[in-house]
């Protein structure tokens, strides 16, 4: 669900390796329709929404999600994504999503404490995303002072999820392949990566060309 990573181009590559892609919440139904017509496998993607609907009944992210799921009911997964899920309305929002979509897999987050993991699973989430601040472009810890070291959060939250028949997804902090192995060893049932895939041509980001001159170059010496 990260800009430059949660794209259809990335999804088409990852689906060849049995990997899921969470498509960004700003993607329109028309863009979904075009991607499906060009070979996107619905079983390999998740639709995504934020929580703007709590305050705005006509929130675009949620209405887009509804339209996409109506067009493509074979999509199995819904991801409800916010940087910090510690606000009083989040659990109630997950309840509402579960009531509206009883047969979908709901991924909710992000949190870092076992108590919140249990609360979300009990109230409708199948998978809880774990991680506040470890992502390569995340500033939540520095801006708000909220966060837990990622491996510690995974270990504690995995134990809580297992106790209520749920799952966790480690989200953030993976810089090297070994970090994925550590997350799985810590108890994560799945791992979300973003920064490791950022910058590839499939991400659709803006291409910037830079000319670098080394110190021995005549231009640099002039």
Enumerate the language-model features and the residues they cover.
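Active-site-proximal glycine-rich helix-loop-beta segment
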Residues: 17-18, 124, 187-189, 217
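Catalytic cores of alpha/beta
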Residues: 113-123, 175-186
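Anion-binding and metal-coordination hotspots
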Residues: 207, 212
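Gly/Pro- and small hydrophobic-enriched strand-loop and loop-to-helix capping segments
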Residues: 190-199, 221
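Single conserved hydrophobic/aromatic residue that forms the stacking wall/gate
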Residues: 213-222
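Active-site entrance/lid segments in N-terminal catalytic domains of soluble metabolic enzymes
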Residues: 1-167, 195-200, 205
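A compact, surface-exposed functional segment
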Residues: 98, 184-190
């Amino acid at each position: 669900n990260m800009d430059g990573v949660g794209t259809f181009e990335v999804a088409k590559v990852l689906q060849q390796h049995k990997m899921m892609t969470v498509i960004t919440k700003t993607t329109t139904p028309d863009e979904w329709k075009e991607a499906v017509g060009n070979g996107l496998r619905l079983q390999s993607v998740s639709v995504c929404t934020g929580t703007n609907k709590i305050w705005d009944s006509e929130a675009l992210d949620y209405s887009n999600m509804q339209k996409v799921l109506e067009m493509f009911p074979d999509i199995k997964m819904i991801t409800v994504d916010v940087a910090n899920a510690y606000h009083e309305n989040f659990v109630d929002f997950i309840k509402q999503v579960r009531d509206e979509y009883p047969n979908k897999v709901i991924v909710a987050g992000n949190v870092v404490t076992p108590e919140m993991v249990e609360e979300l699973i009990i109230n409708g989430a199948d998978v809880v995303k774990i991680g506040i601040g470890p992502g390569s472009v995340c500033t939540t810890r520095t801006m708000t002072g909220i966060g837990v070291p990622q491996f510690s959060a995974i270990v504690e939250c995995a134990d809580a999820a297992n106790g209520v028949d749920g799952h966790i997804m480690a989200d953030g902090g993976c810089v090297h392949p070994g970090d994925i192995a550590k997350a799985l060893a810590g108890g994560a049932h799945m791992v979300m990566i973003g920064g490791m895939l950022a910058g590839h041509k499939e991400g659709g980001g803006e291409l910037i060309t830079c000319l670098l001159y080394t110190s021995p170059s005549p231009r640099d010496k002039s």
